[in-house]
């Protein structure tokens, strides 16, 4: 038996049936429709025809004797296939033999339970929602892609913060139950005592001599000390005329100039002092920077091993604008200050004028005293003659045994009083 030959038809694309509204295709989320004859459909359109995002929003309602259905082409219930692909409906005109093809849109119909209890529950939920929650619901239904992405990110962060807070609270309760409040307060005070000591070199409080409290080897290794021979030659052979020129040109700080004036005549001692003074002068100049933009921040005269030491021990590596850079943070400046004080103590037989150093480092007197006390120096006053025959009080710092007890800064003491 020969197969039946179907008549051919020509396609004719007609666009939307009424010029603006596409044909409606429906699918039911809870099954297949058995008897479509008793369905009553109503299509609702957004009245805002000027807004390009809202003018195509549609809601389709369907009613039967038993149940009502609703579907829409926007919001969370909309089908994504409407934006990813196009749907068409073909109607065969038997008279002309043409297949008229119209644009169509697919709606996912979901059952609507309009029970009184559900409506009252929704009304109550709407009343209890905050303004932020209502705005989030609007963004979820009508917001742009960017707004929805920001909403999802905020919700994820909120969940993460809540989980973190619960974990921290649980951990805190466990620690308090284990150690007790008294032990925790004692630990906090002990940590405060060590805050200002984090940037200090190792302190040997059981030393028998002042020079062993802060050992010179912790400041400069033998290789670093050897590398200072060449750059410190100018200081080692400095003359009175050159010192006067330094004063006139203001090329070096006051402490360095005063130290150069009192260099010992003994060759070995003079060499050691010159190297220490040069390194101290380098630290003070290095501290004046905020960001070190190149590897040789202080010029080609600084030995490579010293440059490496400065970048490694006195800067923080940070990432900014796609580039790594060496930053001299406030804590690193405090560390440099501590090293300068220790070098000055080794240069001046463990008694130094803190006021002169404070001015050279451009520090406040309060901050200088905080660091000096954290280093367990004994602070005293002395009248010093200045220009025009006048005198002023200077603070002296002395490293002597036995060491005084470690003192915290005023900021930490105030914080403990407040708590």
UniProtKB/Swiss-Prot annotation:
GO terms for cellular component: fibrillar center; nucleolus; nucleoplasm; RNA polymerase I complex. Acetylated at Lys-373 by CREBBP/CBP, leading to decreased RNA polymerase I transcription. In normal conditions, deacetylated by SIRT7, promoting the association of RNA polymerase I with the rDNA promoter region and coding region. In response to stress, SIRT7 is released from nucleoli leading to hyperacetylation of POLR1E/PAF53 and decreased association of RNA polymerase I with the rDNA promoter region. Residues 397-419 are annotated as: Disordered. Its main location: nucleus. One of its GO terms (biological process) is RNA polymerase I preinitiation complex assembly. Pfam families: RNA_pol_I_A49. One of its GO terms (molecular function) is RNA polymerase I general transcription initiation factor binding. It is found in: Nucleus, Nucleolus. The modification Phosphoserine is found at residues 35, 163. Keywords: Acetylation, DNA-directed RNA polymerase, Nucleus, Phosphoprotein, Transcription. It comes from the Eukaryota. The modification N6-acetyllysine is found at residue 373. Belongs to the eukaryotic RPA49/POLR1E RNA polymerase subunit family. Component of the RNA polymerase I (Pol I) complex consisting of 13 subunits: a ten-subunit catalytic core composed of POLR1A/RPA1, POLR1B/RPA2, POLR1C/RPAC1, POLR1D/RPAC2, POLR1H/RPA12, POLR2E/RPABC1, POLR2F/RPABC2, POLR2H/RPABC3, POLR2K/RPABC4 and POLR2L/RPABC5; a mobile stalk subunit POLR1F/RPA43 protruding from the core and additional subunits homologous to general transcription factors POLR1E/RPA49 and POLR1G/RPA34. Forms a heterodimer with POLR1G/RPA34. Interacts with POLR1G. Also binds UBTF/UBF. Interacts with PWP1. Component of RNA polymerase I (Pol I), a DNA-dependent RNA polymerase which synthesizes ribosomal RNA precursors using the four ribonucleoside triphosphates as substrates. Appears to be involved in the formation of the initiation complex at the promoter by mediating the interaction between Pol I and UBTF/UBF. This is DNA-directed RNA polymerase I subunit RPA49. It comes from Homo sapiens. The lineage of its organism: Eukaryota, Metazoa, Chordata, Craniata, Vertebrata. The gene is POLR1E.
């Amino acid at each position: 038996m020969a197969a039946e030959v179907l008549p051919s038809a020509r396609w004719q694309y007609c666009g939307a049936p009424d010029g603006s509204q596409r044909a409606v295709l429906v699918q039911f989320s809870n099954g297949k429709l058995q008897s479509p004859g008793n369905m009553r459909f109503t299509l609702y359109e957004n009245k805002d025809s000027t807004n390009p995002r809202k003018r195509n929003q549609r809601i389709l309602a369907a009613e039967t004797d038993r149940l009502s259905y609703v579907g829409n082409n926007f919001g969370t219930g909309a089908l994504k296939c409407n934006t990813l692909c196009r749907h068409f409906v073909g109607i065969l005109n038997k008279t002309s033999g043409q297949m008229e093809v119209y644009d169509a849109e697919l709606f996912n119909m979901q059952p609507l339970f309009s029970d009184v209890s559900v409506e009252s529950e929704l009304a109550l939920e709407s009343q209890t929602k905050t303004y932020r929650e209502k705005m989030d619901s609007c963004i979820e239904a009508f917001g742009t892609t960017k707004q929805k992405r920001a909403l999802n990110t905020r919700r994820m962060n909120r969940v993460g913060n809540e989980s973190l807070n619960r974990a921290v609270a649980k951990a805190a309760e466990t620690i308090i139950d284990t150690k007790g409040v008294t032990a925790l307060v004692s630990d906090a005070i002990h940590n405060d005592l060590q805050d200002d000591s984090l940037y200090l070199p190792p302190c040997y409080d059981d030393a028998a001599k002042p020079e062993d409290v802060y050992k010179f080897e912790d400041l400069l290794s033998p290789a670093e000390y050897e590398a200072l021979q060449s750059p410190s030659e100018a200081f080692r052979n400095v003359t009175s005329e050159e010192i006067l020129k330094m004063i006139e040109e203001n090329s070096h700080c006051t402490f360095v100039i005063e130290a150069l004036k009192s260099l010992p005549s003994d060759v070995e001692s003079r060499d050691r002092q010159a190297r220490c003074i040069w390194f101290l002068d380098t630290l003070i100049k290095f501290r004046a920077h905020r960001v070190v933009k190149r590897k040789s921040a202080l010029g080609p005269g600084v030995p490579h091993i010293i440059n490496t030491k400065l970048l490694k021990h006195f800067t923080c590596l940070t990432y900014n604008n796609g580039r790594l850079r060496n930053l001299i943070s406030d804590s690193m400046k405090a560390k440099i200050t501590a090293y300068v004080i220790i070098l000055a103590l080794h240069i001046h037989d463990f008694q130094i004028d803190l006021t002169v150093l404070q001015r050279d480092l451009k520090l406040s007197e309060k901050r200088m005293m905080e660091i000096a006390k954290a280093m367990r120096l004994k602070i005293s006053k002395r009248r010093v003659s200045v220009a025009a025959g006048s005198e002023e009080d200077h603070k002296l710092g002395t490293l002597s045994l036995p060491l005084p007890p470690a003192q915290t800064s005023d900021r930490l003491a105030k914080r403990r009083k407040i708590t």
